Amino acid sequence: MIYNIVIYFVLCGIAIASLFSKKVRKMWKGEREAFKLLKQKVDPDAKYIWFHAASLGEFEQGRPLMERIRKEHPQYKILLTFFSPSGYEVRKNYEGADIICYMPIDTRLNAIRFLCLVRPVMAFFIKYEFWSNFLHILKYRNIPTYSVSSIFREDQVFFKWYGKSYAGVLRCFTRFFVQNEESKRLLEGIGITDVDVVGDTRFDRVLQIKEAAKYLPICEAFRKGCVPAEDKASDASAEGKASEKDYKVFVAGSSWPPDEDIFIRFFNAHKDWRVIIAPHVIGEDHLKQILSKIQGRKVVRYTQATPEEAAKADVLIIDCFGLLSSMYGYGDVAYVGGGFGVGIHNTLEAAVWNMPVIFGPNNKKFQEAQGLLKSGGGFEINGYEDFEVLMLRFAVSRSENESAGSDSVSFLKSSGEKAGAFVASLSGATDKVMAKVNF
């Protein structure tokens, strides 16, 4: 009852916010048009498997599983739904699903209408997706429903005395495929025992991304300091890296202003490094802000640069989307932004390239970041001084390694190898899920 009242106010809030926000307006329109789209596209004779992801990150977690099912069980069709425009707008043309739409707001009527239209044979909810009305109707209809790559913490409402009523939504799942033993322990503590610890499917996904990495001539020219010959152009993923570098390259991914204040200050003073900056927000105001902070360095923007211009530059600013996961392959050290704000972004996309990963202090809720720290492949900084000490150590170790010969293992190289080994050691979650689901 209380949940449905809250949903009603959420619905009203979205309707009002849609008048002022283009992003919310897209979501509001997409959710209202979902039933129209489903009526047009659902094949009444087909068997659908429903995947729901809140946004782009959760989609990437579920993608290895979707693609395995599509390959090994072609008798099923895939329905993919999103809650957020940041997921739907980017992946609305994804070829791995037969139908892609927004998930309607979680009212009881919407849940009944949706499930009557689609009639899924099973459903997969990725990570933090616990929509009470949809889940209760799925259970009522005896539709197998799985939570994949979910992770639980003791401070979540399900495990508090005042959250017992809402914890009932968890009992709607047929099975949980969780990331760690702590999640299993917490679920068992409230009487939920159909739980398997399989790890995080994101590890499988970043390995896939690395294998399919794009060759980026501008980044190659930037890294080498010369335009690569066409006959040498190759996938960035070859042997885990692009060809041998002449310059030390630092790659900052998904950076925010507090991150940029730290590393730009360092590289203004240490000009032996080349820097790739892929900011989280690529609006003109933010790009101009970044440019204003850089002093005494030649800067080019990716969309405006030629390989010849990139070869002569000191700083390459990425002013477009879709390249970051491949771009890490051209670096020596990675920095993942967000740690001085709401939380760090994807560290695995960098670590898979066998490179040390630096991030800010807001990382405690990110299990993969904690794993990188413990493995010796990740490094937390709390400000400029920490960053300076760490980068100088990386720079010295790289120089010593080059002068000592190939048999010497530097701090930079060993840290990168530990990061890559950490990712490789935790792959395989998709296989474990596939083995447990009855198709």
Name what the model sees in each region:
Residues 1-439:
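Nucleotide-activated sugar donor-binding and catalytic core shared by glycosyltransferases
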